[in-house]
Curated annotation (Swiss-Prot):
Gene name linked to the record: rplL
UniProt keyword list: Ribonucleoprotein, Ribosomal protein
Protein name, UniProt field: Large ribosomal subunit protein bL12
Keyword Ribosomal protein: yes
HAMAP family named among the record's database cross-references: Ribosomal_bL12
Naturally occurring in which organism (per UniProt): Azoarcus sp. (strain BH72)
GO CC annotation terms, alphabetical: cytosolic large ribosomal subunit
Length: 125
């Protein structure tokens, strides 16, 4: 018997956030994809190709180093991303790593300032 889409949606709907996180990681490993890359690419998927000369409107905030106040940096990462403590710590420990991707320039600059105020080294790409 094949599993229907409704069965899958029902199962996913009853999962906790941690279970969903594990499921996403399993998809990434099994199929060799990245959920972050899909989320960034998805909004433009239905439109026409953008001209090459167009100004960049989406930016990635990259944490290059946590600095000496690692706990403060973790707090800022949690507040900005909505991640749990372990996930935010993994981002900080895994530097250089993207904290947020595909955000507006003003939001990227604000997040960069918050992270730098907490003691982190940050770059915007």
């Amino acid at each position: 018997m094949a599993i229907s889409k409704d069965d899958i949606l029902e199962a996913v709907g009853s999962m906790t956030v941690m279970e969903l996180n594990d499921l996403v990681k399993a998809f990434e490993e099994k199929f060799g994809v990245s959920a972050a890359a899909l989320a960034v690419a998805a909004p433009g998927a239905g439109g026409a190709a953008a001209p090459a000369a167009e100004e960049k409107t989406e930016f990635d905030v990259i944490l290059t180093a946590a600095g000496e106040k690692k706990v403060e940096v973790i707090k800022v990462v949690r507040a900005a991303t909505g991640l749990g403590l372990k996930e935010a710590k993994d981002v900080v420990d895994g530097a250089p790593k993207a904290v947020k991707e595909g955000i507006a320039k003003a939001d990227a600059e604000a997040l960069k300032k918050q992270l730098e105020d907490a003691g982190a080294k940050v770059e915007i790409k």
